[in-house]
Amino acid sequence: MNKTELTKLNVGYNLDWLMNLDPRGYGVCRILYDGAIKYTGKPLSLNGAEGLVKNIKKGEKVFILTGFILLPWNEAETDGIISSTVFARFVIRAFGAKPVMLVPEQCEKAIKAMSEVLGVDITYDIDNIPDNTICIVSFTKDKSKEEEQTQEILSHGLPCAVISNEAPGRNKNGYYHNAVGVNTTDIEAKYDVLGNVKAEVFIIFLSVTLAMSLVWALLKNI
């Protein structure tokens, strides 16, 4: 291991440990982290950043999945929407890529508000995404329509990356649950089916690691 590799490793671990601070004693994040780092074999921030730099290409689409709907309010939690919109701007600025945010309809208003703060434009035309623009696609909550919409979206071209950030995922029985075990299947967008795309795309699932990967990938020389 040379000096550069050692520096990457150490900074990667530092970012991981920073993001895993647990002031309230929740504990779950560290359990998940232990499993994830066994899988990657390296700091999650480093793994994510290297994947972003390697796979995201100028002018190509990057799918960003976000928007966990919460009961009883039937609204999306805010951390995923805000951080994903910031990430979309990062994709534009760092790589010149075309971010496509696939979200439940409840997210659209917040994304538009964030876009004004960030100085980016919004479009709904997935075939024509101008520079400095985020494309919004509202994804179905109807399981019987998920495959049809997935194929329609992919007919416009494959993405170079699929990023899932604070987004729900179904269990082996096809159900979605929130953090306290309540079944939320009927209210969640079914976009996690895009994680099964059979193509040579980079698929990464992020939560707090989004911040780690974003900071690291800014270096661009890794």
Q: What function would you assign to each model-found segment?
A:
Residues K98-Q106:
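Short internal beta-strands
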Residues C107-A113, L214:
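Short, charged/polar "capping" segments at the starts of alpha-helices
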